[in-house]
Amino acid sequence: MSIRPLHDRVIVKRKEVESKSAGGIVLTGSAAGKSTRGEIIAVGKGRILDNGTVQPLDVKVGDIVIFNDGYGVKSEKIDNEEVLIMSESDILAIVEA
C-alpha cells in the first residue's frame, strides 16, 4: 500500500536513536524513549493560501527532521510499519549533514 498526504501534510518514519543511561548502559526501544527525529517519506503538494495559490513545502522526501511529537501528529501502521502523519508546521528543523 502507498500513502499520499494531502496539502501541507507529510509522512515521517521515526528514526530510532540510541541513548545511554547515566551509568553508561546503552538503552534501546521503549527504555530510550521515543525519538523526535525522522525521515520524510512522502509530502503533500503544499499549503493552500487565502488567494488560492499553493505554497510548496520546505521539506522534501529524504530529509531528516526534528518534529514536535504532540497533539495533531497521527500515528498509523502502513504495511506493518509505524509512520507519522503531521503538518509541516509540526516540523521544527531539518537536520543537515
From Swiss-Prot:
Q: Which positions carry the signal peptide feature in this UniProt record?
A: none
Picking any one GO biological process from the record gives: chaperone cofactor-dependent protein refolding
Instruction: Extract the InterPro entries matched here.
Output: Chaperonin_GroES, Chaperonin_GroES_sf, Chaprnonin_Cpn10_CS, GroES-like_sf
As for subcellular location, the record says: Cytoplasm
Assembly description = Heptamer of 7 subunits arranged in a ring. Interacts with the chaperonin GroEL.
Sum up the protein's function in the record's words: Together with the chaperonin GroEL, plays an essential role in assisting protein folding. The GroEL-GroES system forms a nano-cage that allows encapsulation of the non-native substrate proteins and provides a physical environment optimized to promote and accelerate protein folding. GroES binds to the apical surface of the GroEL ring, thereby capping the opening of the GroEL channel.
Pfam assignment, any one: Cpn10
- Which top-level group of life is the source organism from? Bacteria
Q: Which UniProt keywords apply?
A: Chaperone, Cytoplasm
- PROSITE patterns assigned: CHAPERONINS_CPN10 (PS00681)
The name under which this protein is listed is Co-chaperonin GroES
Family according to the record: Belongs to the GroES chaperonin family.
Q: What are its GO cellular component terms?
A: cytoplasm
Molecular function (Gene Ontology), one example: protein-folding chaperone binding
